[in-house]
Amino acid sequence: MHRNLGDKDLNLPQYYNNRELSWLDFNYRVLQEAQDKNNPLLEQLNFISIFSSNLDEFFMVRVAGLQDQVKMGYDKPENKAQLTPKQQLVQIKLKNKEIVDLQYKRYNELIDDLKQYQVEIIKPEQLPDDLLPQLESEFKYGILPTLTPLGIDAYHPFPKLNNKSLNIFVDIDTEDDINSAIVQIPSLISRFYSFNKGDKQYIILIEDIITYFINDLFSGYTVLNTFTFRITRNADLTIHEDGAEDLLIEIERFLKERKRGTAVRLEVDGRQATHEDIVWIINQLDVHDNDVYFVDGPLDLTMLTDLVDHLSNKLKYLKYNKYVPQIPQSLGNHNIFDLSLKRDIFFHHPYESFEPIVDFIREAAEDPNTIAIKQTLYRVSKDSPIINSLKNAAENGKQVTVLVELKARFDEENNVHWARMLEEAGCHVIYGMTHLKTHSKIALVVKRMNNKLTSFIHLGTGNYNDKTANIYTDMGLITTNAEIAEDAINFFNYLSGYSVKPEYNKLIVAPFDIRDVFLARIDNEIKSHRENGNGKIIMKMNSLTDKDIILKLFEASCAGVKVQLIIRGICCLKPGVPGISENIEVVSIVGRFLEHSRIYHFHNNGDDIIYLSSADAMTRNMIKRVEILFPVEDKNIAKRLLDYMNLQLSDNQKGRYQDELGQYHYIENNLSPLNSQAFLMKEAMDYGQQLKEDNTRPQVMSVNERKGWFTKIRKQFRK
């Protein structure tokens, strides 16, 4: 793909950010939240945990994929920053090491800060003497029975260690020679143990407890040295869809295989490890020096989520103030089905409650007038009320069709479980589509009303997950629009059968049309700007990687169209480059909630065109996923969306802008402090409070209403 605009070559690598390095920049912005002292202390620790969890997935998928390319001898540069796989791996190591060093520096600072609240993370030898019997009892009865030391010699080869498992390497003097052993720490027991003395709480990590009592595992030998290490394995494996007679069985095979993928990262607690032992482990695991990370602290800081939960009761004032999602402004106290017959209903989670969406499916399942329910599910919670409602609907005799996407990465096992359960309840379950992931969020309820069928459609930007709906920002719409209803019916028929691509009235569906519509809308904005001088595009998404769309945005910028991009994560476009992207602005917001909604706005000379979507402007969303882009035609809802995006562009507390070199900086100006997420929480709470007051205020009846009331009373007495 080569694109010139006049004498400008738009393909030059200096105009682009590499996808993987841009993702690392995003994860650093997550780490910045752990460095932000305006966040409560326990929340700062939580952000360190999120940073680690993100990084695990990055290595299991993205780094693993690059390593596979290098092993196969593939050295073609990617199509934007034009880095080969090997060059990307080198730069990932350099950037990630720098960021991880900052992570551990901040971790150690925060652990030190906990001391002022009478909480200390210590080694066993630092525990007060009178608590040592309790420690010994915990080890003897709660830990030791779960451990299996694995000696390594000619008769005992190096064990196949599980992905993300925590292990202790042990050097043992056996008189004749020095041998090695591995102690794998079971994942199903607690990572830390708490000991109390007065107001003081001592926390000891399980690896430190095992190390303290290590001689009990190797009785009769001398332990010379120990250190902890952790392996991350390749989870970017191929699901063989073509030859699979039953995709459920194939997914289960794939899940077993993924646990034992090749090692892609070795993390070592560098405080005790020796060079000789590290070289030995590297050879056993067949990893390269570039894959080894030494850290100054405990491994796997995802455990901080559990630690924060453990400390939350005692130190709840060191967490965010609890926020309860409010009744949606667009819904108020109305019944969702009654109101949607009159107008579209808009939802903005988590500021507004996800409960009405749960109720939407539950009420449909219970209503005897409901004929059919159809829904796509990508990620749902472990105890999903929506799943329960779909089961109930099928058991109540309604026709229920559910597409459960079995290939939703790291949710495959959960989704296999739900697929089986739904089938047992009598639902017609679709496992997805060959070589595509169904990422769209749509639910269709068909009811018999007044002797005719009426369709109610929910379309959203986020998953039908009642848990993540409290921490992800997402949007949704419920409508009874006849054209969208027809589209929804055709869409589900496409998913459930062998029908070719349907024709749609209003919905725009990938992998067929979303990219083409984006390109056409941008072209139209360029044309409009040349004619009217007011071209403007605002896009909000998680990530931007698709080169066709980036090139078209460059064209728009060169034509003078103002382009504002609100992109939380990966952004392969560099804004502000003179003559190329000088009219493009990129802002990223990382805060309390994960920004997840996708909004696409085209000014269209004042006749605004606004879409919501399940899709980011990423190549995978354009060609490898089934996605839905849907129009927002209600003027009041459209205004809310525009106001929302302008609010986010004004965020000078959690907003960062990207400069022409691809670097991100906090937005600093002389305006009043504005945290867009905090603003929206307050706005929702104010509405909720006003609604509550309106409901409790005595209602004053009109004269006619009073007459009607007295008439009813007289009739009662006549009876």
UniProtKB/Swiss-Prot annotation:
<feature type="binding site">
    <location>
        <position position="596"/>
    </location>
    <ligand>
        <name>ATP</name>
    </ligand>
</feature>
<feature type="binding site">
    <location>
        <position position="379"/>
    </location>
    <ligand>
        <name>Mg(2+)</name>
    </ligand>
</feature>
<comment type="similarity">
    <text>Belongs to the polyphosphate kinase 1 (PPK1) family.</text>
</comment>
<feature type="binding site">
    <location>
        <position position="568"/>
    </location>
    <ligand>
        <name>ATP</name>
    </ligand>
</feature>
<feature type="active site" description="Phosphohistidine intermediate">
    <location>
        <position position="439"/>
    </location>
</feature>
<dbReference type="InterPro" id="IPR036832">
    <property type="entry name" value="PPK_N_dom_sf"/>
</dbReference>
<feature type="binding site">
    <location>
        <position position="54"/>
    </location>
    <ligand>
        <name>ATP</name>
    </ligand>
</feature>
<feature type="binding site">
    <location>
        <position position="472"/>
    </location>
    <ligand>
        <name>ATP</name>
    </ligand>
</feature>
<dbReference type="GO" id="GO:0008976">
    <property type="term" value="F:polyphosphate kinase activity"/>
</dbReference>
<dbReference type="Pfam" id="PF17941">
    <property type="entry name" value="PP_kinase_C_1"/>
</dbReference>
<dbReference type="Pfam" id="PF13090">
    <property type="entry name" value="PP_kinase_C"/>
</dbReference>
<dbReference type="GO" id="GO:0046872">
    <property type="term" value="F:metal ion binding"/>
</dbReference>
<keyword id="KW-0808">Transferase</keyword>
<dbReference type="GO" id="GO:0006799">
    <property type="term" value="P:polyphosphate biosynthetic process"/>
</dbReference>
<dbReference type="InterPro" id="IPR025198">
    <property type="entry name" value="PPK_N_dom"/>
</dbReference>
<keyword id="KW-0418">Kinase</keyword>
<dbReference type="GO" id="GO:0005524">
    <property type="term" value="F:ATP binding"/>
</dbReference>
<feature type="binding site">
    <location>
        <position position="409"/>
    </location>
    <ligand>
        <name>Mg(2+)</name>
    </ligand>
</feature>
<dbReference type="InterPro" id="IPR024953">
    <property type="entry name" value="PP_kinase_middle"/>
</dbReference>
<dbReference type="Pfam" id="PF13089">
    <property type="entry name" value="PP_kinase_N"/>
</dbReference>
<keyword id="KW-0067">ATP-binding</keyword>
<keyword id="KW-0597">Phosphoprotein</keyword>
<comment type="function">
    <text>Catalyzes the reversible transfer of the terminal phosphate of ATP to form a long-chain polyphosphate (polyP).</text>
</comment>
<dbReference type="InterPro" id="IPR036830">
    <property type="entry name" value="PP_kinase_middle_dom_sf"/>
</dbReference>
<dbReference type="Pfam" id="PF02503">
    <property type="entry name" value="PP_kinase"/>
</dbReference>
<protein>
    <recommendedName>
        <fullName>Polyphosphate kinase</fullName>
        <ecNumber>2.7.4.1</ecNumber>
    </recommendedName>
</protein>
<dbReference type="GO" id="GO:0009358">
    <property type="term" value="C:polyphosphate kinase complex"/>
</dbReference>
<feature type="domain" description="PLD phosphodiesterase">
    <location>
        <begin position="434"/>
        <end position="468"/>
    </location>
</feature>
<dbReference type="InterPro" id="IPR041108">
    <property type="entry name" value="PP_kinase_C_1"/>
</dbReference>
<keyword id="KW-0547">Nucleotide-binding</keyword>
<dbReference type="InterPro" id="IPR003414">
    <property type="entry name" value="PP_kinase"/>
</dbReference>
<dbReference type="InterPro" id="IPR025200">
    <property type="entry name" value="PPK_C_dom2"/>
</dbReference>
<keyword id="KW-0460">Magnesium</keyword>
<keyword id="KW-0479">Metal-binding</keyword>
